Amino acid sequence: MPTGKRKGDVESTKFDLVLRPETITFENFRIGWFYTEARLVIKNPTKNRYTYKIKVTNNDMFDIRTPKGFIDPETSIEIELLHVPGILLPRNDVHHFSVYYIKCDTEAQNSHSIWTSKKSEGCKHVLIRFPNKIIRTQEMKKMEEDDMKQQKERNKLSNEKMGIRNQNMGEKK
C-alpha cells in the first residue's frame, strides 16, 4: 500500500513550530467538481524567526497558495491548501503535506537562498483526508437509475416466466 512518502522524507522527532489542524480534511458538498479549500495554521511559539516550506505528495491533486515564506517569533500564519477538481478522490491518509523549517536571522529577505544553502531543521507530515460520505454526482445518480430500470426489467421477465410456470402447474392439477 503506498504511503505517499517521498524518499528521504522523514519526520523530525523535534519540531519547533505548531501545526493546526494535525490532519487536513477537504470537505465540500461539491468536492471533486470545484476547488475545495482547507487551511493550515502554522504557529511559531519561539523567540526565533523561521523560514518555512510546504510540499505535497501529489502536485496535480493539491495546490498550496503560499508554499514558502517567513514566520516571525510568537506569531501565526494561515496557509490556504486546495484540492484540485476533476481528479478522483484518493483513499484517506495516502497523501500528506510536509512542512519544513529553517531558523533564520531577522534581516533575511530571500527564503530561496536560505533553502538552497541550508538543510531543513525540522519536518512534520499533515495527513490528508476526505469525507467518508461523498455526495452522489449526477452521472452516478443516472447510472444507479439505469441499473434500477434494468433490474426491474429482469424481475418483470422473471415474474412473467414464473407466472407461466405457475399457470402450467395449475393446469396439470
Swiss-Prot record:
Compositionally biased spans, kind Basic and acidic residues: 141-163
Stretches of the chain forming a coiled coil according to its record: none
Record domain MSP: where: 16-133
Transmembrane stretches, start-end: none
Region annotation (Disordered) ranges: 141-173
Entry-linked PROSITE patterns: MSP (PS50202)
Protein name per the record: Uncharacterized protein ZK688.12
